[in-house]
């Protein structure tokens, strides 16, 4: 079947191609972050930055820019459709990546990174809205989890990609090659993706209407607790991401093996997404994610005890962080699915404002966690525990004090639209 508003000459996507395409759009953003990790020290030194923690800003500025930029694409996509917003984001991403490759000072790089992140935030927002256009309930959670599984190939490989480019061509070519990949993805989307927004769900661009839609998405009790909880959990991971090169490569002494350790941890996260995609329709998004949150808190408490004991080894740290990343994967797609479920008619605006709220919270707190790096794993471990406990309180708020409820019994989830995905 064709989607609403689809072009007859464009053949429908199969489910596998649809999932890989959505993952590829999100992966461009991840590539702009994770491929930079091995090059942070070199970039900072070559562009004249002297404070060792300032190198983290190459990552932190991008995360924050993506968070701020997430507020607008949903409203535009609810009016004009998903495709125009995607192509605008892809164009900005490509041009700014090329500009970053040509900078001559650290401040200019940070400014361009911020602008690139602001303008390309639709690459993160639109896949969630497109999936919501097509599916609901646990089926939507499975699709998001499967997309996240494919997407996780990039964080696994990106640091090694970045290190290889750094060694053979220099850090500027990392930006250049991300631009080339963006052009390739743009061509694919142009040729294969039909518009998924139902014309009946188009929203007018009126500030009052946009504000009402966004207010609706943020005032729903069943949703907002999950949005904020997700932001708190991911703040810990962003804190790790910001300081990972210093923490793993320098403090724990991984050195040139840092990309391998990072790939191993990210690979565990990918496997967790695979597990989630297989079990979520059987057990339900709430049961899976609530169990993961409780395990996250328990493991964070163990991390705190090991960090303050002062004898934590690289292997112990890597194993515990890999486990935490697995648990985050079991929460991520499920929290997103639960928080988007009430908003079928305003999926774009809801996805945008939720992504904005979640990302601003996680990027600001993650930046603060990264900047608090003191040569030990203590700040990170403490932040993971505090974030997990606060997230539990917020989930309990959204669930009226009851965990593990199953609202969509197995077999009752169904697609709500068919955008040519089958």
Please give the residue ranges for each predicted region:
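Juxtamembrane intracellular "pre-TM" segments in multi-pass secondary transporters
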Residues: 5-12, 194-226
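Extracellular/periplasmic helix-loop-helix junction of adjacent transmembrane segments
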Residues: 39-68
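Helix-breaking motifs and short loop linkers at transmembrane-helix boundaries and internal kinks
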Residues: 49, 81, 102-108, 119, ...
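Conserved MFS/SLC helix-loop-helix module at the cytosolic interface between two early adjacent transmembrane helices
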Residues: 67-107
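Paired small-residue
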Residues: 92-99, 107-115, 315-323
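Helix-loop-helix hairpin linking two adjacent transmembrane segments in secondary transporters
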Residues: 108, 137-138, 142-191, 197
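Cytoplasmic helix-loop-helix junction between adjacent transmembrane helices
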Residues: 112-153
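A late C-terminal transmembrane helix in Major Facilitator Superfamily
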Residues: 335-378, 383-384
């Amino acid at each position: 079947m064709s989607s609403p508003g689809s072009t007859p000459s464009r053949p429908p996507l199969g489910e596998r191609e649809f999932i890989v395409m959505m993952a590829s759009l999100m992966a461009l953003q991840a590539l702009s972050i994770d491929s930079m990790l091995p090059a942070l020290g070199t970039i900072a030194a070559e562009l004249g930055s002297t404070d060792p923690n300032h190198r983290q800003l190459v990552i932190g500025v991008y995360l924050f820019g993506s968070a701020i930029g997430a507020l607008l694409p949903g409203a535009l996509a609810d009016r004009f459709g998903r495709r125009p917003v995607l192509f605008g984001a892809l164009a900005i991403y490509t041009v700014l990546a090329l500009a970053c490759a040509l900078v001559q000072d650290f401040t200019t790089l940070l400014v361009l990174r911020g602008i690139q992140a602001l303008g390309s935030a639709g690459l993160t927002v639109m896949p969630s809205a497109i999936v919501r256009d097509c599916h609901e309930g646990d089926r939507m959670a499975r699709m998001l989890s499967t997309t996240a599984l494919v997407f996780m190939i990039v964080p696994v490989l990106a640091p090694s990609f970045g290190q290889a480019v750094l060694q053979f061509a220099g850090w500027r070519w990392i930006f250049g090659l991300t631009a080339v990949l963006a052009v390739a993805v743009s061509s694919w989307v142009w040729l294969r993706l039909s518009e998924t927004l139902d014309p009946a769900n188009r929203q007018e661009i009126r500030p009052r209407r946009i504000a009402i839609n966004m207010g609706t998405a943020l005032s729903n009790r069943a949703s907002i607790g999950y949005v904020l909880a997700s932001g708190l959990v991911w703040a810990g991971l962003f804190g790790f991401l910001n300081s990972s090169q210093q923490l793993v490569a320098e403090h724990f002494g991984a050195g040139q093996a840092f990309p391998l350790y990072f790939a191993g941890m990210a690979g565990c996260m990918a496997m967790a997404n695979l597990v989630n995609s297989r079990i979520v329709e059987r057990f339900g998004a709430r049961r899976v994610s609530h169990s993961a949150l409780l395990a996250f808190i328990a493991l964070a408490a163990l991390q705190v005890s090991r960090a303050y004991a002062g004898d934590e080894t690289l292997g112990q740290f890597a194993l515990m962080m890999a486990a935490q990343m697995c648990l985050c994967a079991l929460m991520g797609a499920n929290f997103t699915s639960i928080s988007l479920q009430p908003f079928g008619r305003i999926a774009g605006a809801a996805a945008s404002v939720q992504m904005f709220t979640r990302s601003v919270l996680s990027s600001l707190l993650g930046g603060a966690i990264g900047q608090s790096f003191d040569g030990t794993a203590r700040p990170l471990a403490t932040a993971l525990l505090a974030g997990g406990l606060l997230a539990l309180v917020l989930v309990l708020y959204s669930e009226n004090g009851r965990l593990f409820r199953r609202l969509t019994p197995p077999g009752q989830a169904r697609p709500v639209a068919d955008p040519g995905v089958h």
